[in-house]
């Protein structure tokens, strides 16, 4: 266990920013609210703790990066309050979603982590995805200790290549094990250069991801949106398809939102999933 020192800095965030909603919005699976009130985020080789102090002030403590890295991660260069205002009035359901989801932001996450995470996500609930991803990190990710908190970084392609099929299956990956093995082998050998894909336009990036074993349209869209910041891409999963059928008469509304389609998808997804679960709990 490697003990690391954290850099602390007071930061101010005045735009929409709700850490609980971000964590529960279905786009990230390792961030966590700790018992001491801190929020922990991991991305690539970087670690961040945010402690809310009130009035948009936070104690930010990080390792393996700087605040600029995390400002980009949280998409702080985009005004989400203004974006919500610009989207309002197009449909009553969207208006409810925008109000309910105030504070959500689309995170700019590590492409490698997003590829593996969303390969794992297929036919799994959000709690099950979190469990599998955490098991994978604990199995071969680098362990760190920071101010009394022990964490495991997300495994590199090389670290994943070092695991046997039995070890991967033991992380709850099931039939997805083959997909993870193939992706790790390609990324480790250089056959798959996720960094180089950044230069591709949306359609070419999407097509390249579809060439990977186990990657369908939903997974490719998720990696494009959450790993590469392609906000015109809107993943359609079970929740979103149900919403399209029930609220939009079966018509896909996302093309009409242009470059904001992926952000709109997050508001709609969060509202649909949250309200459906609330109704289910009351029954």
Residue ranges and their predicted role:
Residues 1-283:
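HhH-family (HhH-GPD) DNA N-glycosylase catalytic core used in base-excision repair
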């Amino acid at each position: 266990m490697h003990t690391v020192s954290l850099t602390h800095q007071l930061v101010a965030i005045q735009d929409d920013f709700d850490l609980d909603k971000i964590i529960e919005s279905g786009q990230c699976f390792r961030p966590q609210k700790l018992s001491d009130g801190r929020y922990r985020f991991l991305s690539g080789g970087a670690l961040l703790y945010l402690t809310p102090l009130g009035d948009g002030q936070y104690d930010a403590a990080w390792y393996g990066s700087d605040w600029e890295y995390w400002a980009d991660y949280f998409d702080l260069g985009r005004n989400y309050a203004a974006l919500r205002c610009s989207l309002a009035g197009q449909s009553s359901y969207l208006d409810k979603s925008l109000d309910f989801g105030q504070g959500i932001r689309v995170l700019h996450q590590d492409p490698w982590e997003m590829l593996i995470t969303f390969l794992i996500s297929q036919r799994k609930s959000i709690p099950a995805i979190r469990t599998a991803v955490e098991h994978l990190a604990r199995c071969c990710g680098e362990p760190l200790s920071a101010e009394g908190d022990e964490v495991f970084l997300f495994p590199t392609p090389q670290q994943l290549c070092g695991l046997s099929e039995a070890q991967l299956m033991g992380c709850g990956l099931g039939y997805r094990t083959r997909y993870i093995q193939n992706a790790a082998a390609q990324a480790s050998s250089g056959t798959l250069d996720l960094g180089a894909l950044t230069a591709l336009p949306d359609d070419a990036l999407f097509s390249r991801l579809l060439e990977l074993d186990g990657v369908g349209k939903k997974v490719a869209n998720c990696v494009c949106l959450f790993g590469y910041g392609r906000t015109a891409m809107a993943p359609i999963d079970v929740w979103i398809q149900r919403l399209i059928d029930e609220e939009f008469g079966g018509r896909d509304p996302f093309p009409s939102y242009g470059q904001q389609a992926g952000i709109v998808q997050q508001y709609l997804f969060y509202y649909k999933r949250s309200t459906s679960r609330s109704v289910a709990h009351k029954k």
